[in-house]
Each structure stands twice: as structure tokens, then as C-alpha cells.
A protein has these predicted regions:
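Short, small-residue-biased leader/transition segments that mark boundaries at the very start
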Residues: 1-3
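Anion-binding alpha/beta catalytic cores of soluble intermediary-metabolism enzymes, centered on
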Residues: 17-352
Length: 352
């Protein structure tokens, strides 16, 4: 069954768990800007039009100005008030080139090569954030996750205390009772086979993001084994990661290693994890590797009728995010709000 036949039929209730009213109020009180590198895509144009109509978040569209206006006209959306930037005519390009050469000096960056690289809207947009011209960036509508993350890593880097950048996906769907079900999955987009310590960091960042989504994280380190029922190096890796996490963050509820059925089904948990208070009730899932995470989230999205938010990038030193290329205009709009407001104002110092 298809939950929504068209974007217009997606009820606002799907997004209530994210408390967008609070995010919008925050943005009205503390105005922000968001760079959208794929300025000619109809989904980006529609999202920008909605942001402009709401007058709470200023979109910055990257692209040839004539092409952006033509795309807006063809799509039938009003983007008056949007700022459009074209790399080839950007007035501060000389300054941008100088800064980019400084950042990449150890890699032998030359001005000629820098000018060529900065024609790429993702590099250009990321440098706008680095220079402090604008506040946040959302890409991935027409490009891969790597196209967004590579310039972010090269230019922005990780925040203090983080050793890697990871990602999570927020999945939400309405319940018949009128509220929403929300689960968070990590890492689904970046780290191919994280080590034990990397899994601990991924779990911590994913749990903090779950709090941003309005849920109390109950974390499951997923495996094909539940508490030693299976054997193998991947089981050991997840078991050790779960133990390290519990030792480092004893105030955060977690379980592992555990199979998915025992993590979400109270009936199965009663058999496989007797005595566990959170088994069967977890909502934040840490996958052992990228294959499992990416496949798992797409199964949930397409067969479970979940609305997806992300991949949300975790650990960067600036609010930069990406979408998947199959995203809708509605997802661009809502992820723009999340990126500018929620991810730009996170405070989890008690967990760090």
C-alpha cells in the first residue's frame, strides 16, 4: 500500500514529532540562511518558494541566474526574494580562492586548480559556510552523499571531540492513534565497516540526534546474534562496542549485541533477552556496517511506509546536511528547516 499518492496528500501530522512549529519560531527569533547548491532542481525551487512564503528562513540558491529563473518559471513557483549566486560571477571569488588554497595548502592547491574546483556548487556552497557568509547547507538532491560530504570534510572538518563523520536517518510514520512513530538508524550512508570505537561514537551521535527528533533514545547494537547466540568477528565487534558504550555512557539506555526482532518485539525479547527492560522497546538502531544500514533503512522506507529524513550528517563542525536523490520537495523543505534550526542549535554538552 502506498501511504501517500502525491506530495500534496502528505498530512502535516507526519512531521509533528519533529515539532516544526518550535523550529520555525526559533528561526523567526534568530533568522538564519541556508545554501541550496542545486538551485535549478524543481524540488529545490518548490522548497525555496515555500520558505520564502513563510518568511522565516532565507534560501540561497546556487546556479546560473537565468537558468534558476527559467526553472522556477517552468515549475510554476515564485522565488522572488531568493538570493541567487553564480560561482563564475561571485564578487568575493578571489577571497574564496585564497582561503581555499590556505585550507588545502598541504595538498599543493594552486589558485588555478582552486578556481576550477570552486565551480562545483558543492565546493562553492561549502566555502560560503566556511567564510561565514551563510549559516547552513543542504545538498544531495541531484548529487550523491559523497558529493556533499567530501567538500565538507576537506573544508569544514569535524567538530571538537569527534574523530569521524557519520550519518543517521530519521524515519517517521503516523499511527492510527493520531501520534507518530519515530525511529532513528545509524550509520546508513558513510562508514563502510566501523570499528568498535567508531560504533561507540556513531551510537552517541545518533542518540543525540534521536533526542532532537523528540524521542528518548533506547539504543540497540544490531547483529545476527543476541547475547552470544551466534559466533563470529562481527558479533564480537558489536558486542564489544555495546559494552564500551554502556561503560562510557551509563546514563543512556542501550542493549547489544541483539537481533532486530528481540530489539523491537516484547514477545521475542521475553524469550531472547529475559530480564532486559529495554529489549523489545528500542527506537535507535546501530547497524554493524554500511550494507546492513543502507539496505535496512530503504526496506523500512519503501515497505514500511515511513517518511525519511536524511541522511543527517553527524560530527561536522557546521550544520551541513544531505538528502537522497529520490527525495521529494517536501523533504527538501522540511530538511532545510531541520538543518538550519535543529542542527544549528544543538546542545548536548551533558552527553559529551
Amino acid at each position: 500500500r502506498v501511504l501517500f499518492r502525491s506530495e500534496d496528500e502528505r498530512p502535516w501530522e507526519v512531521f509533528l514529532m519533529f515539532d516544526f512549529d518550535s523550529y520555525i519560531r526559533l528561526l523567526r527569533e534568530d533568522p538564519k540562511t541556508i545554501v541550496l547548491p542545486e538551485g535549478t532542481d524543481p524540488r529545490v525551487i518548490e522548497a525555496a518558494s515555500r520558505l520564502l512564503a513563510g518568511n522565516f528562513l532565507q534560501p540561497i540558491l546556487i546556479g546560473e541566474e537565468d537558468a534558476v529563473w527559467e526553472a522556477a518559471q517552468e515549475a510554476g513557483y515564485n522565488i522572488r526574494g531568493a538570493k541567487i549566486l553564480t560561482p563564475s560571477t561571485y564578487e568575493k571569488m578571489d577571497e574564496m580562492v585564497e582561503q581555499f588554497c590556505e585550507i588545502r595548502a598541504k595538498k599543493g592547491m594552486t589558485q588555478e586548480k582552486a578556481r576550477e574546483i570552486l565551480k562545483d556548487p558543492n565546493y562553492f556552497g561549502t566555502m560560503l559556510i566556511k567564510m561565514g557568509e551563510y549559516d547552513s547547507l543542504l545538498g544531495g538532491v541531484m548529487h550523491s552523499v559523497i558529493d556533499t560530504i567530501k567538500p565538507a570534510l576537506e573544508i569544514i572538518g569535524t567538530k571538537e571531540g569527534n574523530n569521524l563523520v557519520s550519518s543517521c536517518i530519521g524515519l517517521v510514520r503516523p499511527r492510527a492513534t493520531g501520534d507518530s512513530e519515530v525511529i532513528v538508524l545509524g550509520d546508513c550512508a558513510l562508514n563502510i565497516k566501523p570499528t568498535e570505537d567508531e560504533l561507540v561514537e556513531i551510537a552517541h551521535e545518533t542518540a543525540n540526534c534521536a533526542r532532537d527528533f523528540g524521542i528518548d533514545p533506547k539504543i540497540a547494537f544490531l547483529s545476527y546474534s543476541t547475547h552470544g547466540s551466534g559466533k563470529g568477528p562481527d558479533v564480537d565487534r558489536m558486542c564489544n562496542a555495546a559494552n564500551k558504550f554502556a561503560e562510557k555512557y551509563p546514563h543512556m539506555e542501550s542493549i547489544g549485541e541483539v537481533q532486530f526482532d528481540a530489539a523491537v518485539s516484547p514477545a521475542v525479547a521475553a524469550t531472547k533477552c529475559p530480564g532486559s527492560e529495554i529489549a523489545g522497546h528500542t527506537n535507535t538502531f546501530i547497524f554493524p556496517d554500511l550494507s546492513a544500514g543502507n539496505i535496512g533503512y530503504k526496506i523500512a522506507r519503501y515497505l514500511g511506509n515511513f517518511e525519511a529524513f536524511g541522511p543527517i550528517l553527524l560530527g561536522l563542525n557546521a550544520p551541513i546536511n544531505t538528502l537522497s536523490r529520490e527525495c521529494s520537495a517536501s523533504e527538501v523543505y522540511h530538511m532545510s528547516i531541520l538543518t538550519a534550526a535543529m542542527l544549528g542549535h544543538r546542545d548536548h554538552s551533558k552527553d559529551s
